[in-house]
UniProtKB/Swiss-Prot annotation:
<feature type="binding site">
    <location>
        <position position="134"/>
    </location>
    <ligand>
        <name>substrate</name>
    </ligand>
</feature>
<dbReference type="Pfam" id="PF00293">
    <property type="entry name" value="NUDIX"/>
</dbReference>
<dbReference type="InterPro" id="IPR015797">
    <property type="entry name" value="NUDIX_hydrolase-like_dom_sf"/>
</dbReference>
<comment type="pathway">
    <text>Porphyrin-containing compound metabolism; chlorophyll biosynthesis.</text>
</comment>
<dbReference type="GO" id="GO:0050992">
    <property type="term" value="P:dimethylallyl diphosphate biosynthetic process"/>
</dbReference>
<keyword id="KW-0460">Magnesium</keyword>
<protein>
    <recommendedName>
        <fullName>Isopentenyl-diphosphate Delta-isomerase I, chloroplastic</fullName>
        <ecNumber>5.3.3.2</ecNumber>
    </recommendedName>
</protein>
<keyword id="KW-0413">Isomerase</keyword>
<dbReference type="GO" id="GO:0015995">
    <property type="term" value="P:chlorophyll biosynthetic process"/>
</dbReference>
<feature type="binding site">
    <location>
        <position position="95"/>
    </location>
    <ligand>
        <name>substrate</name>
    </ligand>
</feature>
<keyword id="KW-0007">Acetylation</keyword>
<feature type="compositionally biased region" description="Low complexity">
    <location>
        <begin position="20"/>
        <end position="39"/>
    </location>
</feature>
<keyword id="KW-0414">Isoprene biosynthesis</keyword>
<feature type="binding site">
    <location>
        <position position="208"/>
    </location>
    <ligand>
        <name>Mg(2+)</name>
    </ligand>
</feature>
<dbReference type="InterPro" id="IPR000086">
    <property type="entry name" value="NUDIX_hydrolase_dom"/>
</dbReference>
<feature type="binding site">
    <location>
        <position position="111"/>
    </location>
    <ligand>
        <name>Mg(2+)</name>
    </ligand>
</feature>
<feature type="active site">
    <location>
        <position position="146"/>
    </location>
</feature>
């Protein structure tokens, strides 16, 4: 049985997206936008592999022979931002090291991350199923986009959470083909932060301070199959049905641990604010919720 057949609501496969999914970004209401931020520069171009990263690739070839080539490149090219439990920057390391459970446990490696929750003008939430080639949590269903700000000038800006917003805009394009004009950085509303740890398998896992960003926009989608297997807009009730299937042990309906933490602790009350146009009232960026 296919994954899509398990749900009572429509799904959209990468190579057959329905035209109705896309609409002009002009329909977004300004009531959801936080105060305007200063214009920003485009994210810095990706650089070539460092000597350290190249050496790491060479040394781990035998251990990670089955890793997808794109994911392998990102594992060593991307430098995550290391933080302490108060979200203070303490350094940086490769995405590879930051997701090795051995490193996480031995060195308490903790990195900064973000999770985007994008709603359309009907207040439906866009979900994605992670691609089968993802190193951590392949083929699980999760929120719109989950990734990391990188250790680069434009994504280290602390003021107004601008660095994380810049990273979110970058990854929405990388994963879902959403152009920057459809998701202006000043329309992301940071609602909170949570600290969690979640092993994916015996080798890989997550240990993150995760920024939770909400945005209401109608966008055009062109998902990247290296990152995303499937996408789907869901209503609140449809999401509840999805959670029930996951709780029943349906192997084809697995949810990412960070998404489940947000669903269980925050999402439904925040969804109320989305529908009322009062989303900024829900923001609490002083607290780091340890879950």
């Amino acid at each position: 049985m296919s994954t899509a057949s398990l749900f009572s609501f429509p799904s959209f496969h990468l190579r057959s997206l329905l035209p109705s999914l896309s609409s002009s970004s002009s329909s977004s209401s300004s009531r959801f936008a936080p105060p305007r931020l200063s214009p920003i520069r485009s994210p810095a171009p990706r650089t070539q592999l460092s000597v350290r990263a190249f050496s790491a690739v060479t040394m781990t070839d035998s251990n990670d022979a089955g890793m997808d080539a794109v994911q392998r490149r990102l594992m060593f090219e991307d430098e995550c931002i290391l933080v302490d439990e108060n979200d203070r920057v303490v350094g940086h390391d490769t995405k590879y090291n930051c997701h090795l459970m051995e490193k996480i446990e031995a060195e308490n490696l903790l990195h900064r991350a973000f999770s985007v929750f994008l709603f359309n003008s009907k207040y439906e939430l866009l979900l994605q199923q992670r691609s089968k080639t993802k190193v951590t949590f392949p083929l699980v269903w999760t929120n719109t986009c989950c990734s990391h700000p990188l250790y680069r000038e434009s994504e280290l800006i602390e003021e107004n959470v601008l660095g994380v917003r810049n990273a979110a805009q970058r990854k929405l394009f990388d994963e879902l083909g959403i152009v920057a004009e459809d998701v202006p950085v000043d329309e992301f509303t940071p609602l909170g932060r949570m600290l969690y740890k979640a092993p994916s398998d015996g080798k890989w896992g997550e240990h993150e301070v995760d920024y939770l960003l909400f945005i209401v926009r109608d966008v055009k989608l062109q998902p990247n199959p290296d990152e995303v297997a499937e996408i789907k807009y869901v209503s609140r009730e449809e999401l509840k049905e999805l959670v029930k299937k996951a709780d029943a042990g349906d192997e084809a309906v697995k949810l990412s641990p960070w998404f489940r933490l947000v669903v269980d602790n925050f999402l439904m009350k925040w969804w109320d604010h989305v529908e009322k146009g009062t989303i900024t009232e829900a923001a609490d960026m002083k607290t780091i919720h340890k879950l």
